[in-house]
Regions:
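Short, surface-exposed acidic-centric catalytic microdomains
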Residues: 28-68
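Glycine-rich phosphate-binding loop signature in dinucleotide/nucleotide-binding domains
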Residues: 76-83
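Charged helix-capping and loop-helix junction motifs
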Residues: 68-74, 123-127
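Donor/substrate-binding cores of folate-linked one-carbon enzymes
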Residues: 84, 88-195
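N-terminal Rossmann-like dinucleotide-binding module
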Residues: 1-43
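Short acidic active-site motifs
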Residues: 43, 72-73, 94
Length: 196
């Protein structure tokens, strides 16, 4: 059984999808044992508590350097014997030490069809604003393995979502979450936990 940590920075809607998927038995080879938030007080921590999952806060602001933050995060993950890491709206960049320690065992969900609207500066509503400004007809979500390149790791799963007339960044964001992210992320986690 793979021990999974989910890293979050906000409300934790993707975390909720992962926890509910696990509760339905859709990841028989993995168990979420830790939620790490990038700041205190985020609703994702309450979601973790509601499912009886231990949580921790590792905030980049509390460390003098990126290397110190990386070391602290790695220490928390290793102290909990974590095998697989999920970035579910985690807005801090992982450093080389964490990536090296969990090579091919870190997955990220990105709210676009990579290689479109990805890389530095493309996160949250900014992705959907860019998609609408460009006038794309399809957007979606991608789950990929994490490497040293921002949004550059091997793609595991993608799902397209149609852009509707009158969409705002907020309505598009919600539809991409419901129709793509919440479907793909649990499937990708099950794949990684099964060593697929």
């Amino acid at each position: 059984m793979k021990r999974v940590a989910v890293l979050v920075s906000g409300g934790g809607t993707n975390l909720q999808a992962l926890l509910e998927s696990e509760q339905r038995g859709e990841n028989p080879n993995g168990k979420i044992v830790l939620v790490v938030a990038s700041k205190p007080g985020v609703y994702a921590l309450e979601r973790a508590a509601n499912f009886g999952v231990e949580s921790a806060v590792v905030s980049r602001r509390d460390y003098a350097s990126s290397a110190d933050f990386d070391a602290a995060l790695l220490g928390v993950l290793q102290a909990h014997d974590i095998d697989v890491v999920v970035l579910a709206g985690f807005l801090s960049v992982l450093g080389e030490r964490v990536i090296a320690a969990y090579r091919n065992k870190i997955i990220n969900v990105h709210p676009s069809l990579i290689p479109s609207f990805c890389g530095p500066g493309f996160y949250g509503l900014k992705v959907h604003e860019a998609a609408l400004a460009r006038g794309v007809k399809l957007t979606g979500a991608t789950v990929h393995l994490v490497n040293e390149e921002c949004d550059g790791g091997p793609i595991l799963l993608q799902k397209a979502v149609a852009v509707q007339p009158g969409d705002t960044p907020e309505t598009l964001q919600k539809r991409v979450m419901v129709e793509a992210e919440w479907q793909l992320l649990p499937k990708a986690l099950a794949m990684v936990c099964s060593d697929e």
